[in-house]
Curated annotation (Swiss-Prot):
Monomer. One of its GO terms (cellular component) is cytoplasm. This is Peptidyl-tRNA hydrolase. Its EC number is 3.1.1.29. GO terms for biological process: protein quality control for misfolded or incompletely synthesized proteins; rescue of stalled ribosome. The active site is at H20 (proton acceptor). It comes from Streptococcus sanguinis (strain SK36). It is found in: Cytoplasm. The keyword RNA-binding applies. Its main location: cytoplasm. The keyword RNA-binding applies. The record marks D93 as: Stabilizes the basic form of H active site to accept a proton. Pfam families: Pept_tRNA_hydro (PF01195).
Amino acid sequence: MVKLIVGLGNPGEKYIETKHNVGFMLVDKICKDLDLKFTADKIFQADIASTFLNGEKVYFVKPTTFMNESGKAVQALLAYYGLDIEDLLVIYDDLDMEVGKIRLRSKGSAGGHNGIKSIIKHIGSQEFKRIKIGIGRPKEGVTVVHHVLGKFDKDDYTTILNTLDKVDNAVNYYLQSGNFEQTMQKYNG
């Protein structure tokens, strides 16, 4: 079996550790813990790291297409490796959830998230696993764009780092168990 673990975000230095990049932050954390290095792949428009875990090949992916075109990279990788959407797990930010909250789902709509909209459009399905990480709503007077492209304040950053530990554990549990239903029961909240 092969798994494709995709963290969503925007490429480039100015987006590092912005709220919209929590998916990248999580995939970076997992790969750092596993001592994996990313390779830029221009054909797939993604940074990719891979390893074998429990006898399964696992690809960790950060699309370099910018958020709104993430589906291009995901679709290309699924097609190239002959993977089914059952093998896909996407991690991304959710501004409708409180900072640091996580929600695991086996399917669902885009919920207004442009990266997820792009994936749904390109793979033709909403039936893929996802982990949403709460980044909270914008404060009064702050636009959604400025909010999601902004950095976390000190307290929220500490919360997010703790959340990334929890999501890292959830992803590892899923990769070890192979059972996303069990993972949802254990880690939702």
